Amino acid sequence: MSEKYVVTWDMFQMHARKLSERLLPASQWKGIIAVSRGGLFPAAVLARELGLRHIETVCIASYHDHNNQGELQVLHAAQVPNGGEGFIVVDDLVDTGNTARAIRQMYPNAKFVTVFAKPAGAELVDDYVIDIPQNTWIEQPWDLGLTFVPPLSRK
């Protein structure tokens, strides 16, 4: 990845709330399926904004280190009826589409949304808020901490 896109908590909440608005009216939804781990954060915002209390998880491991995607491993799958009909599946982003394709097979009738989308996977989700170039790594706020940054003159 040659570029980085740093997301702050404020930015993330703003984008997740925008996604929530697009999912109104809330009465059409039975619940949320959060894709662990990145989808847990937007799921919390969606649950609050839409007044939903039924939250399930699907746990898929694909990034085995910070930069490299590996073979998908389904660690846990939410058991919901009718292929996820009436459920929102949410993840933080769709990148190559590998995880999204697996999710689509598991929950073909769910509404699949993400906060961020890269070109290779964007067509696999029903809605998203922000376009991100394919060669850009997203630094999510839950992966960051506050730290001292030395002045440029000291490098």
Swiss-Prot record:
Name this protein carries in UniProt: Xanthine-guanine phosphoribosyltransferase 2
Which Gene Ontology MF annotations are present?
guanine phosphoribosyltransferase activity; hypoxanthine phosphoribosyltransferase activity; magnesium ion binding; xanthine phosphoribosyltransferase activity
Q: Name one GO biological process term.
A: GMP salvage
PANTHER family per the record? XANTHINE PHOSPHORIBOSYLTRANSFERASE, XANTHINE-GUANINE PHOSPHORIBOSYLTRANSFERASE
The organism's superkingdom is given as Bacteria
EC number(s) per entry: 2.4.2.-, 2.4.2.22
Which positions are annotated as binding guanine?
A: D95, I138
Question: Which cofactor is essential here?
Answer: Mg(2+)
Q: Which UniProt keywords apply?
A: Cell inner membrane, Cell membrane, Glycosyltransferase, Magnesium, Membrane, Metal-binding, Purine salvage, Transferase
Query: Which InterPro entries does the record associate with it?
Result: PRibTrfase_dom, PRTase-like, Xanthine_Guanine_PRibTrfase
Cited PROSITE patterns: PUR_PYR_PR_TRANSFER
Which residues does GMP bind?
D95, T96, G97, N98, T99, W137, I138
Q: Which family does it belong to?
A: Belongs to the purine/pyrimidine phosphoribosyltransferase family. XGPT subfamily.
Q: Which organism is it from?
A: Haemophilus influenzae (strain 86-028NP)
Q: What is the lineage of its organism?
A: Bacteria, Pseudomonadati, Pseudomonadota, Gammaproteobacteria, Pasteurellales
For binding xanthine, which residues are annotated in this chain's numbering? D95, I138
Q: Subunit structure of this entry? A: Homotetramer.
Query: In which compartments does the protein localize?
Result: Cell inner membrane
Task: Quote the function comment for this protein.
Answer: Purine salvage pathway enzyme that catalyzes the transfer of the ribosyl-5-phosphate group from 5-phospho-alpha-D-ribose 1-diphosphate (PRPP) to the N9 position of the 6-oxopurines guanine and xanthine to form the corresponding ribonucleotides GMP (guanosine 5'-monophosphate) and XMP (xanthosine 5'-monophosphate), with the release of PPi. To a lesser extent, also acts on hypoxanthine.
